[in-house]
Amino acid sequence: MFKSSKKEDSSKKNHNNKLIFAIRKLFSPIKNFFRQTKTPDNFFGVIKRLKINNQKMTLDECNIFANLLKIKDKTIADIMVPRSDIAAIKLTTNLEELSESIKLKVLHARTLIYDGTLDNVVGFIHIKDLFKAFATKQNGCLKKLIRKHIIAAPSMKLLDLLTKMRRERTHIAIVVDEYGGTDGLVTIEDLIEEIVGRIDDEHDQQLDSDNLKVINNSTIILNARVEVEVLEEIIGEKLKNDDEFDTIGGLVLTRVGSVPAIGTRINISENIEIEVTDATPRSLKQVKIRLKNALNSG
């Protein structure tokens, strides 16, 4: 049986909470200072006041703090992905058609779904949900896989959008113009990166085209550094029984005992075969995951 999406939603919620907690903790030494003092808009003025009050910040803290001062005036229009760069799928596309199209074009971790035209976005699908549907041989349209998004105007402040995303518990906002047409999109990762810089998310493992590629309904390609839990969530099968390894590469090395050569195939379970597609003499780089049941049934 495949795992419920409740665990995934809970994991995302916990991850977002941890990120917000980390940002709050980062500024705890100066929290009281801001409550008692009028905050100057000039960054260097703030640093001078902190120095006078014997408050210290690391270089990373200074960079994040500078970004926070800048972001307060930024709007969605400053960072959104424009309409021309949006990748989306028609609502009428069925899973069988999508399985075939994936062979030619790799989807993003989150892909928008529209009804009729891009001006009528109905939500988005996550690539992990899509592969689960393939693995369980689900048929029909994409409606049952769609997750909700929110609507925002280009003029909305970024901090207001971040608050709204947390309240609505969604990761994507569709930006609309004055006529209601789709102008662009913004993800929660875009917002956080405006504050802390580029994030290498060890929980989601940046499930983009660099780390996870769906080839068809029985095959995916994974970066060997992707955590085992990510694969477990996708296929709904427990692969890790202890803390001996964390990544897909660690799983393979534990089973084989050394770095296998390219082309080596390892049976991880009755239903899962891993093939090494990229490796050096010292490390595993990339693997191909095959679901045998799906192959045999096809």
Curated annotation (Swiss-Prot):
One of its GO terms (molecular function) is flavin adenine dinucleotide binding. It comes from the Bacteria. Keywords: CBS domain, Repeat. Residues 80-141, 145-202 form the CBS domain. One of its GO terms (cellular component) is plasma membrane. Coiled coil: none annotated. Belongs to the UPF0053 family. Hemolysin C subfamily. It is not know if this bacteria is hemolytic. This is Possible hemolysin C. It comes from Rickettsia canadensis (strain McKiel). The gene is tlyC.
